[in-house]
UniProtKB/Swiss-Prot annotation:
Widely expressed with highest levels in liver and skeletal muscle, and moderate levels in kidney, bone and pancreas. GO terms for molecular function: folic acid binding; transferase activity. InterPro entries: Formiminotransferase_N, Formiminotransferase_N_sf, FormiminoTrfase_cat_dom_sf, FTCD. SMART domains: FTCD_N. Residues 1-20 form the signal peptide. It holds the Pfam family FTCD_N. This is Formiminotransferase N-terminal subdomain-containing protein. Belongs to the formiminotransferase family. GO terms for cellular component: intracellular membrane-bounded organelle. Keywords: Signal.
């Protein structure tokens, strides 16, 4: 039996944060993704995973939501100065570049002057933190894709 109902289109966000030692900070950032400005839970937003690497002092928070909720990325860049958002996959229209293609294009694993890069949303990357620039002691890089 097949269903004619179209499933929910999802988007995922890989939020890279330059913090791993203070677990409560990473958890608070993850909780912030789940709540609206009134403290109520967004019904279609989930934190799928939190990975913290003590050696590299960074954490990656994987967030999934309905494609309809992608305005959250725009809200985030307004409320977190220095946040850069790079889109890939179905979110990267019209090119639809994969994460690997975007990282190569951005020189993600090479030393380069990131100040010339323009993110899809948010501030240009800073020299201090590279692609994950922020003025608040945290460094953020967001990648959005649809699946």
């Amino acid at each position: 039996m097949s269903s004619s109902r179209v499933g929910l289109r999802l988007a995922a966000c890989l939020l890279n944060v330059s913090e791993a030692g203070r677990k409560y900070i990473v958890e608070n950032i993850a909780k912030a993704a789940l709540l609206d400005k009134n403290g109520k839970k967004h019904p279609q937003v989930s934190v799928l995973n939190i990975f913290s690497d003590q050696d590299y002092k960074r954490s990656v928070i994987t967030i999934a939501t309905s494609v309809d909720k992608l305005g959250l990325a725009e809200d985030l860049v307004l409320h977190v100065p220095g946040c850069s958002v790079f889109l890939f996959g179905e979110a990267d229209l019209p090119e639809k570049r994969s994460l690997v293609q975007r990282r190569k294009q951005l020189g993600w694993f090479t030393r380069r002057d990131f100040s010339a890069l323009q993110p899809d949303l948010g501030a240009a990357p800073s020299q201090r933190c590279g692609l994950t620039g922020s003025e608040h002691g945290f460094c953020f890089a967001l990648f959005f894709f649809f699946f």
